[in-house]
């Protein structure tokens, strides 16, 4: 749907259907805002066994969309998309299969063939979060790899992916020319506590760290980011709940 926003009042109007795609779970604008990418969180996109990504050109005059192309997301259930800072590649996290991938963005905004695919693997995380408050019923999908987010750091040299099912934050090096993802050494850092369920994160403005939300533990953890190596180091963890909750 396209919605018009009044910049002065924030009022929303003119809700208009502009395109139909299967189960659109997440979307992101390309660098510059001229293109839009939409993830279809399915496992049978266009008759295949994976999810899909649809690329659109955005009409700057009215916000209308023109479909450019569609690609296989290289895994089942894609739930997160992000562009690299230079706008040359699109990153995708496939939740159901636990795989992540990079796609080249062509000059016209179309997506090319995947330049890199990484299947995250390992033992499943704890079924119940160790750091959860008493009475918490937060238990979900600690049964195998489930990539929940992927994003490049502000420098564009490193890529990070949270895996809720494995309780890990994966660390990759990114070749900006080829779009190849290479596991860093070590390839991941464990979540702040067993069963924490790392989900989404944001980088500091300086690019020297990130804040990560642990969905199951209801906590926020800060990770220091070494700009030379791209490696993360766990810092402080705080509760995301009100005092006494």
Model-inferred region functions:
Residues 41-47, 96-99, 166-168, 217-219:
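Short glycine/acidic-enriched loop and turn motifs that connect beta-strands
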Residues 38-39, 92, 161, 212:
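Residue position within the beta-strands of beta-propeller blades
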Residues 156-215:
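Loop-centered beta-sheet repeat module
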Residues 1, 51-54, 99-101, 168-170, ...:
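A short loop-to-beta-strand structural motif that recurs across blades of beta-propeller domains
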Residues 3-10, 56-63, 102-113, 172-181, ...:
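Short loop/turn segments immediately following beta-strands, especially the blade-tip
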Residues 21-32, 74-89, 121-156, 191-209, ...:
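Beta-rich, blade/repeat-based domains predominating
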Residues 14-87:
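Blade-loop segments of beta-propeller domains
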Residues 13-19, 66-71, 115, 134-140, ...:
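A short beta-strand motif characteristic of beta-propeller blades
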């Amino acid at each position: 749907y396209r919605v018009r926003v009044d910049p002065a009042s924030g009022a929303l109007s003119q809700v208009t259907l502009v395109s139909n795609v299967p189960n659109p779970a997440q979307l992101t604008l390309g660098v510059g805002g001229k293109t839009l990418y939409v993830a279809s969180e399915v496992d049978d996109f266009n008759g295949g066994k994976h999810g899909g990504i649809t690329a659109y050109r955005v009409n700057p005059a009215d916000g209308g969309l023109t479909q450019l192309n569609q690609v296989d997301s290289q895994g089942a259930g894609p739930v997160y998309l992000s562009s690299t800072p230079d706008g040359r590649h699109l990153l995708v996290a496939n939740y159901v299969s636990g795989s992540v991938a990079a796609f080249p963005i062509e000059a016209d905004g179309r997506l090319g063939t995947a330049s890199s695919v990484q299947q995250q693997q390992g033992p499943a995380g704890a079924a119940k979060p160790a750091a959860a408050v008493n009475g918490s019923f937060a238990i979900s999908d600690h049964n195998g790899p489930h990539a929940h987010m992927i994003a490049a750091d502000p420098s564009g040299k490193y890529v990070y992916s949270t895996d809720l099912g494995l309780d890990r934050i994966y660390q990759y090096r990114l070749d900006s020319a080829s779009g190849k993802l290479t596991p860093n050494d070590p390839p991941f850092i464990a979540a702040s506590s067993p069963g924490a369920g790392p989900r989404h994160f944001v980088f500091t403005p300086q690019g020297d760290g990130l804040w990560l939300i642990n969905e199951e533990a209801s906590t926020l953890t800060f990770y220091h980011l070494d700009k030379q190596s791209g490696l993360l180091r766990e810092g402080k963890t705080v509760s995301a709940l009100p005092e006494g909750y």
